UniProtKB/Swiss-Prot annotation:
Name under which the protein is recorded: Envelope glycoprotein gp160
Ranges spanned by the short sequence motif Di-leucine internalization motif, renumbered to the chain: 846-847
Domain notes: Some of the most genetically diverse regions of the viral genome are present in Env. They are called variable regions 1 through 5 (V1 through V5). Coreceptor usage of gp120 is determined mainly by the primary structure of the third variable region (V3) in the outer domain of gp120. The sequence of V3 determines which coreceptor, CCR5 and/or CXCR4 (corresponding to R5/macrophage, X4/T cell and R5X4/T cell and macrophage tropism), is used to trigger the fusion potential of the Env complex, and hence which cells the virus can infect. Binding to CCR5 involves a region adjacent in addition to V3. The membrane proximal external region (MPER) present in gp41 is a tryptophan-rich region recognized by the antibodies 2F5, Z13, and 4E10. MPER seems to play a role in fusion.
Region described as V5: spans on this chain: 451-461, 453-461
Gene field: env
Gene source species: Human immunodeficiency virus type 1 group M subtype B (isolate WMJ22) (HIV-1)
Stretches for region V4: 379-408
Record's signal peptide: 1-31
Length: 847
């Protein structure tokens, strides 16, 4: 019977073991994913950063005092690389592009810096007595009317401030205005004296634009849209990455965009909002239109002393004169307008397009203003914008001449485009001036009014130089490269396994760099990561302070705007690299491109499978999906690495147990002897204490202490039957033993008693655990059998019910089918018997 019971128990244990093994296999089938760090992933985010310039200034001009100061730029890359980004769609917005704002600020700074050491013309803000200058034109005819040039005399301080003498100078009519309230029409003043500080451009300053390449520092990149019909806003599917832009000439002009880039296929018109007439329309031409400008007459510069160390440079006109003018091919211009009209009609629902002259404003806006050979031309563009287009037919241009000649006027006192309250005096240029430029774009404004009108009127615009820069930077944007990426993988870092300890590290994260100085070394070690990060932040802050100081004192350091940008770009690149390397070091991933961690992947971050992530998503798409959880993942990796560091430290402290040979070291033996003596002493002490307590207890019960030789009764074991001992004695369950003699015997008896006690208690505990396990197994097995029987019963009932239902349905269907067949048969018989019934009826009728 016992053998059968053992076999039944073994069967139960076998079944239980099989079930547990199956459950373990099912649970282990679920793959555990772990966070893996990748360095160098192709991920970027939109950013604003300090760009620096690259230019080949020597190839364009040897003049060291060019206003653009491009000699401070780095040389251009002879082999620029452009990487096409396949399967990438990126959004661009030319109207909200920080590159435009940065270029605008740079050009303003360059102009201000170039004019800063030049002479202020405040002493010339005096009363001028002016008369018209008699000029001979190319027909040898004296011209007095019109007064294009004024000969003005004035009192001026010489090299000695207490001495004044009379001088004269020639001014253009546009540069002087009559003094108000003065009836004498010959009294004038300089036009900007009451509103601006006039600075005379230095004699060696040149305004010839040199192509400037804007470059991104290390850690950043410039994305370029290569869609040939890109309108400046929205998604771009043909994207590439470059380190520098193409060469951009910072041409300061209004109405017409000069010497820029061309559209690759057809003309493109761009506007932030075509329905808003306050928004400028930028027209990007696909073919340039040449404009040739000339100032025919000859000038000779003369210098006037206007104070100690100051000189005012004026002119003398020698020889014949023609009015300054510009020539444009009429056929090319009309063909260009025709293509522009086609694009405008697409936007404005096939309305009649009308081009009209500027509606008024400052001379810079009303005319086409630009710099030609150092002189500032203001050309009347009415002939360019004076036509009506109904479809592709032009009205209003009936002239047969092949050239359009724009009359131009020259100003020497220029309203600075950088801001209000600034003006510049451009010294006269000697000799004849000729310049040839290419019109590559237009700036247009649209009249508002009745939207139901059949006409749309467009006028030349400009004045906001940001639109000039925007026409070249529309296809670029700056992004910050994020080389650190995290993704789930099946790989886990093999580390020293140890339970985490609940240490208050969260509070330590908010300590400052020196906040842990008064803490213990153990508590301070928890803030090492924080201290490293704070240290880098301090370095970055110190560099930023240095840059601000340099920027504020650049006039003393003789640094150009480009020099400041070079320094900023280099510092920024170092900061970016240090930040990434610091994070890799904190995570224990220094020098690794792929670094596994012990952080389990949380499905709440992304519940996509491995195949969906690695086979279907790009790094950019993956980064957008987990962007909200990146900081959490970073903090978990950091905590995991900190715990790993503590585990390794504790492991190293236990490293002396790695070799058993160390156990035989003399120092270890002395330690073993010390421990043995302490144990023996403790046992002896416990023996003495228990003996004293036993004696005291017996004395309290009324017994007197006996000799240690007295036999004491000891309880008989339950496995010993009652009986007579070998030497006789009473028939009870007790036996007497003598107390041991000697020190070693006493120790041995105590150790034996302790071991027996431990053995009995452990055996009892194991028996209890065994009974509990058997009881739970038996109850569990009975419960499983009950549920199995219940499942079989209900399965059988459901089966019988289903069979009965099917039988009933089959019987009902069969009976119904039989009845239908019977009815059909009767109908068919009746139809078949109709002729017979007719015949029988006829026979009866005949009888």
């Amino acid at each position: 019977m016992r053998v059968k019971g053992i076999m039944r128990n073994c069967q139960h244990l076998w079944i239980w073991g099989t079930m547990l093994f199956g459950m373990w296999m099912i649970c282990s089938a679920v793959e555990q994913l772990w966070v893996t760090v990748y360095y160098g992933v192709p991920v970027w985010k939109e950013a604003t950063t300090t760009l620096f310039c690259a230019s080949d200034a020597k190839a364009y001009s040897t003049e060291a005092h060019n206003v653009w100061a491009t000699h401070a730029c780095v040389p251009t890359d002879p082999n620029p690389q452009e990487v096409i980004l396949g399967n990438v769609t990126e959004n661009f917005n030319m109207w909200k592009n920080n590159m435009v704002e940065q270029m605008h600020e740079d050009i303003i700074s360059l102009w201000d810096q170039s004019l800063k050491p030049c002479v202020k013309l405040t002493p010339l803000c005096v009363t001028l007595n002016c008369i018209d200058k008699n000029i001979t034109d190319w027909k040898n005819t004296t011209i007095i009317g019109g007064g294009e040039v004024k000969n003005c005399s004035f009192n001026i301080t010489t090299s000695r401030r207490d001495k004044v003498h009379k001088e004269y100078a020639l001014f253009y009519k546009l540069d002087v205005v009559p003094i108000k309230g003065d009836n004498n029409s010959s009294r004038y003043r300089l036009i900007n004296c009451n509103t601006s500080v006039i600075t005379q451009a230095c004699p060696k300053v040149s305004f010839e634009p040199i192509p400037i390449h804007y470059c991104a520092p290390a850690g950043f990149a410039i994305l370029k849209c290569n869609d040939k019909k890109f309108n400046g806003t929205g998604p771009c599917t043909n994207v590439s990455t470059v380190q520098c832009t193409h060469g951009i000439r910072p041409v300061v002009s209004t109405q017409l965009l000069l010497n820029g880039s061309l559209a690759e296929e057809e003309i493109v018109i761009r506007s932030e909002n075509f329905t808003d007439n306050a928004k400028t329309i930028i027209v990007h031409l696909n073919e340039s239109v040449e404009i040739n400008c000339t100032r025919p007459y000859n000038n000779v510069r003369r210098s006037l002393s206007i104070g100690p160390g100051r000189a005012f440079r004026t002119r003398e006109i020698i020889g014949i004169i023609r009015q300054a003018h510009c020539n444009i091919s009429r056929a090319k211009w009309n063909n260009t307008l025709k293509q522009i009209v086609e694009k405008l009609r697409e936007q404005f629902k096939n309305k009649t397009i009308v081009f009209n002259h500027s509606s008024g404003g400052d001379p810079e806006i009303v005319t086409h203003s630009f710099n030609c050979g150092g002189e500032f031309f203001y050309c009347n563009s009415t002939q360019l914008f004076n036509s009506t287009w109904n479809g592709t037919d032009i009205k209003g241009d009936n002239k047969n001449s092949t050239l359009i000649t724009l009359p131009c006027r020259i100003k020497q006192i220029i309203n600075m485009w950088q801001g209000v309250g600034k003006a510049m005096y451009a010294p006269p240029i000697q000799g004849q001036i000729r310049c040839s430029s290419n019109i590559t774009g237009l700036l247009l404004t649209r009249d508002g009014g009745n939207s139901s009108s059949r006409e749309e009127i467009f006028r030349p615009g400009g004045g906001n130089m940001r639109d000039n820069w925007r026409s070249e930077l529309y296809k670029y944007k700056v992004v910050r490269i994020e080389p650190l990426g995290v993704a789930p993988t099946k790989a886990k870092r093999r580390v020293v396994q140890r339970e985490k300890r609940a240490v208050g590290t969260i509070g330590a994260m908010f300590l400052g760099f020196l906040g842990a100085a008064g803490s213990t070394m153990g508590a301070g070690s928890l803030t090492l990561t924080v201290q490293a990060r704070q240290l880098l932040s301090g370095i970055v802050q110190q560099q930023n302070n240095l840059l601000r100081a340099i920027d504020a004192q650049q006039h003393l350091l003789q640094l150009t705007v480009w020099g400041i940008k070079q320094l900023q770009a280099r510092v920024l690149a170092v900061e970016r690299y240090l930040r990434d390397q610091q994070l890799l070091g904190i995570w224990g991933c220094s020098g690794k491109l792929i670094c596994t961690t012990t952080v389990p992947w949380n499905a709440s971050w992304s519940n996509k499978s491995m195949n969906q992530i690695w086979d279907n998503l790009t790094w950019m798409e993956w980064e957008r999906e987990i962007d909200n959880y990146t900081s959490i993942i970073y903090s978990l990796i950091e905590e995991s690495q900190n715990q790993q560091g503590k585990n390794e430290q504790e492991l190293l402290e236990l490293d002396k147990w790695a070799s058993l040979w160390n156990w035989f070291d003399i120092t270890n033996w002395l330690w073993y002897i010390k421990i043995f003596i302490m144990i023996v002493g403790g046992l002896i002490g416990l023996r003495i204490v228990f003996t004293v307590l036993s004696i005291v207890n017996r004395v309290r019960q009324g017994y007197s202490p006996l000799s240690f030789q007295t036999h004491l009764p000891t309880p008989r074991g339950p496995d010993r039957p009652e009986g007579i001992e070998e030497e006789g004695g009473e028939r009870d369950r007790d036996r007497s033993v003598r107390l041991v003699h000697g020190f070693l015997a006493l120790i041995w008896d105590d150790l034996r008693s302790l071991c027996l006690f431990s053995y009995h208690r452990l055996r009892d505990l194991l028996l209890i655990v065994k009974r509990i396990v058997e009881l739970l197994g038996r109850r569990g097995w009975e419960a499983l059998k009950y549920w199995w029987n219940l499942l079989q019963y209900w399965s059988k009932e459901l089966k019988n019910s289903a069979v009965g239902l099917l039988n009933a349905i089959a019987i009902a269907v069969a009976e119904g089918t039989d009845r239908v067949i019977e009815v059909v048969q009767r109908i068919c018989r009746a139809i078949i018997h109709i002729p017979r019934r007719i015949r029988q009826g006829l026979e009866r009728a005949l009888l």
